[in-house]
Curated annotation (Swiss-Prot):
Substrate binds at residues 160, 169, 296, 321, 373-376, 397. SUPFAM superfamilies: Enolase C-terminal domain-like, Enolase N-terminal domain-like. It catalyses: (2R)-2-phosphoglycerate = phosphoenolpyruvate + H2O. This is Enolase-related protein 1. The gene is ERR1. It comes from Saccharomyces cerevisiae (strain ATCC 204508 / S288c).
Amino acid sequence: MSITKVHARTVYDSRGNPTVEVEITTENGLFRAIVPSGASTGIHEAVELRDGNKSEWMGKGVTKAVSNVNSIIGPALIKSELCVTNQKGIDELMISLDGTSNKSRLGANAILGVSLCVARAAAAQKGITLYKYIAELADARQDPFVIPVPFFNVLNGGAHAGGSLAMQEFKIAPVGAQSFAEAMRMGSEVYHHLKILAKEQYGPSAGNVGDEGGVAPDIDTAEDALDMIVEAINICGYEGRVKVGIDSAPSVFYKDGKYDLNFKEPNSDPSHWLSPAQLAEYYHSLLKKYPIISLEDPYAEDDWSSWSAFLKTVNVQIIADDLTCTNKTRIARAIEEKCANTLLLKLNQIGTLTESIEAANQAFDAGWGVMISHRSGETEDPFIADLVVGLRCGQIKSGALSRSERLAKYNELLRIEEELGDDCIYAGHRFHDGNKL
């Protein structure tokens, strides 16, 4: 069944910035997808096409991307008469229409919106759920399905919040839960106790939340953040059952080969900046003191040697995000140089569902884990909930248990777990090996 109509429009993400929504019509009806956007974006990501007209939307308009869907991609898809279930063929057609290595002509935000819409339409044509369709595309096992461990970003710093805290995300992971539903309850309880502690220690405004729903108190150091998180976990009685993860996002504070943990201070003293080896020592001190099971982006996106040196010294999950940008060439290099052991997969970093699936399988084939991720500028579209189940990744991060654009993904996972019943398992402590369960 081919596509009969393609239409894009401007809608708004969770930060109030314009983004692209795409609708596709087939004989089965109308299907819709909305594209997210990031705040701390890697320089190697596919291009999110923005208008750049400072007089409208502060330069963040997406009218060019919308027009590219309506005037170039849509007509080409309809003319091609490609069946909606030909995901790879449709994605390859759009990549060919763009003709660049980073989707800078048409925009990854234009191409991805169509790609995700096509998957929804194809699942409907086949009469199966979206996660089952994605599993078919990825040639992933479906017996049983794996429900992921949620890594809740409960405390925000870095580019996602005000205050002086350099590191961007402090996450909790209910690995000791017996189900996703229980993980949600545990996460909710810890999050609310953390909010209470933040207000008690830093004042009423400390309960205000950042872009991803986590509290954003005016904290100075990672130790201050981790002490408060561990206290909240212990208050709930979940010691040993709820672990911790960190996303440093250090590319924003990488300067002249060193790392400036005081980068938010306008007159930061260069003598206090850390060398890669000193930063490694700092990470090791945190790993010894706190129940940390996952470190994302410990080093900057092109500091390859520091990544590979650090991986040899730890036995926790090391996630590559800005380093790899869901890009198969960079993933291959990271695998070859032994820089990490887990891929963070973001759909809009690469721009099509087909390439995202290929990136996940590339990581799995190397023995890596894969974590599915939202973006800081999110929408109500829950596509990544189906993606993480379809790919058997075993882990997802979609912010805190706050803000509806974050809960849209978690609530969809609750529905999927309930629907599957005995035909699914919760990844739990084996979150890194979801594809092997």
